């Protein structure tokens, strides 16, 4: 490294001196070397007055809380070339302890013993008079506390009224420090609290405090986002309203026609029809209905049942869409097929998915889907004796298809063949030694024929 680079560089300090001189000149026009015209003016006086009308409150905490409104003032009449320090302290405004009752502050007893006197020194202190006069003096960093923690915070008693005071002190030079003047403003009085008591004060703090506005914006934003989200979800899921709150037209209207007579031991016709109509209306609102659950039939009366398709053995709920309306005059019947493996095949003929033939005579009924009959019949176990509900049944082969008035009924309503819903299943009249459900006659017990006949 050469000797030229080792030498200290030559600085031009003229621009630094000019900057200091201009800084001193900026506040000189407001100065007064005699300090006789010293004046301190409160900034934001109108805002302070709005809080004062409602009895202003300031929060005090253990760690300290900043003031709002911020205490700031403009100073004029200082000696621009003299050094000054500006301090802030708080003096009790009265001799009362206050309490908030029925929406207003009222005196609540004698005051507590005053805390140790403390003062807040402005961070720019000490400084030239020109510096203090060039712009307003703000005490934005002062913190109010209810604990004496020795960190330079101002300690105040809660529920006591205070008034801030600004002190201007001249420092430096051969002269000793001396107090020039103190200034106080009645608009800045407040009651120290640990939590805001007056809701109006809280609203003013939120409205005018820039830091509280951020909290208010977050709150309003959250509410708007919730409303927007709620509005956006409504068109995406229009079925929710009718799914949870169906319209009055889908809530179980009274039906004079019953699907199941009480004699079959089925559930209440009204409740069942309500359930069918209700779930039918609800399923119509789904974009993808639930798949129909399989129906497990524990007892199969005939071997022909085992050969039916799976769709014909579904539960009642998904099958209701294929039901024929009540009151239809169409008669359904099929050729009687007696299964050799079933003893009473003639009485309960098998139901298959094949096409049915029109009936010849013996009763009028209402056609119902095959799954309805099977679901109704599956509730009854196959009897081991030759009687059902007290009525004997003929042995196998004793019932022929030539029985006048016999049909292959496909529904419980057809089995009744016009009987009253309160009659028993076994109360059918007979033709010879055979049951004829379509004929309504007097009670006549049946006796099975002798083996030799």
UniProtKB/Swiss-Prot annotation:
Residues 47-217 bind DNA. SMART domains: TBOX. GO terms for biological process: cell fate specification; heart morphogenesis; mesoderm formation; positive regulation of DNA-templated transcription. One of its GO terms (molecular function) is RNA polymerase II cis-regulatory region sequence-specific DNA binding. One of its GO terms (cellular component) is nucleus. Residues 283-304 are annotated as: Disordered. This is T-box transcription factor T homolog. It is found in: Nucleus. May be involved in the transcriptional regulation of genes required for gastrulation. It comes from the Eukaryota. Keywords: Developmental protein, DNA-binding, Nucleus, Transcription, Transcription regulation. The lineage of its organism: Eukaryota, Metazoa, Echinodermata, Eleutherozoa, Asterozoa. The keyword Transcription applies. PROSITE patterns: TBOX_1, TBOX_2, TBOX_3. Pfam families: T-box. It comes from Patiria pectinifera (Starfish). SUPFAM superfamilies: p53-like transcription factors (SSF49417). InterPro entries: p53-like_TF_DNA-bd_sf, T-box_DNA-bd, T-box_sf, TF_Brachyury, TF_T-box, TF_T-box_CS.
